[in-house]
Each structure stands twice: as C-alpha cells, then as structure tokens.
Amino acid sequence: MKKRMFLGIAATVLALLGAGAFLARHRPSVDFAAAAAANRPPSIRPDYSDTVIPPNIAPLNFLVEEPGTDYAVRIGAARGRAIELRSRNAHVVIPMTRWRQLLEANRGQDLSIDVCVRGEDGRWTRFDPIVNAIADDAIDNYLFYRLIRPIHTVYVDVNIYQRDLRTYAESLVVSNRSFGGGCVNCHTLAPNHPGRMILQTRGVKDGVSYNGMIVVRDGEVKKVDTRTLVRPDESDRGRIGKAMAAYSAWHPNGQILAFSANDIFQFFHAVGEVRDVFDRESDLALYHADADTVTTTPDISRPDRLETFPAWSPDGRFLYFSSAEPRPQSQHKEVRYDLMRIGYDAATGRWGDLETVLPSKQTGLSITEPRVSPDGRWLLCCMSEYGAFPVYQPSSDLYLLDLETREYRRLEINSPRCDSWHCWSANGRWIAFASKRRDGLFARVYFSHVDESGRVSKPVLLPQKDPSFYDRFLKTYNVPELATAPAPASSRALGRAIRAPSDGSSRGATWQPPPTGKLQ
C-alpha cells in the first residue's frame, strides 16, 4: 500500500514538473520591438560581452543583473534559427545542442544576444544587444588544472582535473587521496604527443615516500626520481642531484624533458598578500626518457645564477628559461629574473651559446613563466615586481614579446590583481591563464583569442552550467594547461605509479655527460 502511494505521488510530481516545463517552453513569445528601449546593454554576470568566443566552447550561461519579474533572451546570428528563452528568474541556461549548431554554422560571424526584462509594473524593457564575435579558430578540446584550497601549507584535497571545454564535463585525473594526502602538481603535457604527460608528487607517510616524477609515455606509467640519475657533482652546487624535478617542459620530439630542480621555501608577510615563496637555489637539466638518464650543461646550472621555468621553442632548437642572481632571503624584493635562451640540438645533444633575450634591468620587473607560441612568433610571460612565484604577486601581469623584433608590451587584458600561469592552444590562436581579478583570492581560468598581429581579445571566463557557480566555489584553479586530447592514463594507473618504488623501471640507469662541443 505504501509502495503504491509513493509511486502515485512520484507520478504526480513528475507530471506537474513536465507540465511546468511544457508551459515554460510554450509561454507566449515577447515582442522585442514593442518593448521600451533602455538605450544601454544589460548588466550580465559573468561578463560575456564584446569579446571573441571559441566556436567549440560550452554554452556561456549567465545571470541577468537587472531587476524584473520575467526575462526573455534571444540569441542569434546570420545563419540558423535563433535560440529564444523565457524565464521568471534571471538565470539564462542555454540548450547545449542548439548552441553548438548556432556557433558551428556561424564561425567568423557575430553572435547577438538580445535581452528583455519585465518590471513590477508589467512593462517590458528592451536592452541594447550584446555582440560577440565567433572565432573561426577552435580552442583545444580539453583543459587540465589543479584545484586547491587557498590555504598555506596543508595538502587537503589536492586534485588534478580535466575539463571537456565543449561541455561542462569535469573528470578526475589524479587525487592526493590515492597516496596518503601529499602534494601533486606541475602537470605537463607533450605538444603533438597526446599520449605523453608528466606530473610531480611530494609526500612521505608512515615511512613510505611518494616523492618522484610520474612519466606517462604511450601507455606506460612509471615513477622516476631524477636525483638518482645524476652524479652529485654534475653541477657546482649539485642542485640537480639534491632536489626533485619541479617545473618542466617537453621537447617537441616527445623524448626529452627539460626540468628545474628548486630549493624553495614559503614565508609570510604581515599585510596584503601574506603568502610568498623564495627560491634559494635552482638549476636546469634534461631527462632523456628513452635512455632514462639526466644530463645538463654549466650554462643552465651555474652556481652564481638561479635558473627555472624551462620552455622550448616549437622547433626544439632553443630552450628558454628565467635566470636571476641569487640573494639572501632578506633581500627577496631585489631578486628579478632575466629571460634567457640557449641553443640545443636534440639529434646530437650539443648545446649552443647562452643568450639574454630580455634583461630585467630593461623592464624593471622580474620575468617568469615564458611560453612560446606554436608558430614561434610570440613569447608570453609574466612580469612582476620581484621573485619567481607570480601567483602570489598582485603585481603580476601578462606580457607578450615579439621574438622577431624583441619588442614587448603589457597586455590590455590584465587586471589590477594577479594574472599569472598561462599556456597556448595547439593552433596558437588562444591563450588560457589564471587570474584573481574577481576577488583577489581565488584564481579562475580565462581564455583570450590572439590574432596574427598579436592582438588579444577580452578574456572569457571558463563557463559553468550554473552561472552562479563561482559565487560559492571556494577552491582556486591552478596551472591551467590546454590539451587536444584527454589524459593518457587513468587516475587508478597514476595512483599505482605514485605508490610504487621510485626505482622501478629506472633501476640501473646511469648518469651520462653531455657531448663535448657547442652548436655552430
């Protein structure tokens, strides 16, 4: 009897919901032309207006921040049927299929959003259209990022996720819960080699070490401790042999990984952004995945310099990085990094000459996190007042350097708050970056289109199904990385590799000195 009553109530509820949905879809349409003109565009949140959007992005749902009792929205373009929505609340949720069809049919065209709001007096007000350009260039289908809490030193729920940018689907890549609650970070994907990825892990629990570099190559997943593959005297300071790999970059051939070995510590200020990080020592080296060996050269592991943030040119002929003169921690605000590069021949292993691309004395700022565009024309980097940890620098801005002319400029898309970690799409027409522009505390991911001349469009916030999502989401997005394919290994396989001994398939590997001679 109770079961029949429950089923009856459930059926009634479903019927009412269905009727409500039907009525919502079939409410009388609004005559936009007859509505009174507001003579201004509507206020919406997130601010998806006057920008360029990817043709393959998920629907840009938004809130209409105008008081009213009824809302009508029409989204249209030159080709195809417009999307018409009607709601008694300000949430605008766009149907996925119709959105995709509209954007795909109108690549390179404008997208117009018309909004009408009915006030308490029953009268409709029509706002000026919001117009965005639909790019002809697609953005990469996937975005990788780490989600962390904005705390100082406790590793709580440190997870790396991947998001399908065509939808709202988010899936776990790896969680620190799979190996005792340590740290997982610095995920790096190989350009043109979707089956390859690395990430770094840190942690010791109950006498078990989870420290190491997880290397994924075409189905094989293993943990490597780069410290065991280098002689302690490889560099004058031996930092490569003492510190684990940190920031890294795959060579375009997918066989070599440049990485930094850093000795850093966190400290705190009394006011403002209280968190900060100081780099006491850092060097660069190469991990050769096929041979399972590590090599370096004195020019990238000097005892009188700090070298970090490696980044390859798309042809693999140059390794870009940041370099600074070390100073005591009491002088941390005097540490400013130069932008450097050095030639490299992957076929012979020979190094070229060291070159200063852009000195900090010229900019007056610390230059970090260099990333070269896929066509080799542009270099995107961060500049901040000092140091090598721009995510904690409110002064951090994005700069674009023309590698042909060596001219650089501060991008117009920067905010008064921290704009930091960034990457390029595979086609070089989009950048993704982390920004704290909303509140100064939580970093969110934004996208901007970059045209052939280096002009960058107004940033687009990573869309969510619920347009009010970011108002209550209390985690920060860290290290956004675009990718053309999903993660090449399951979270279970990555967890097994993290928990495995770090020697594993690396047992018996030996250090190899670099070939003598330099590039001509």
Which functions belong to the PLM regions below?
Residues 1-13:
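N-terminal Sec-pathway targeting helices
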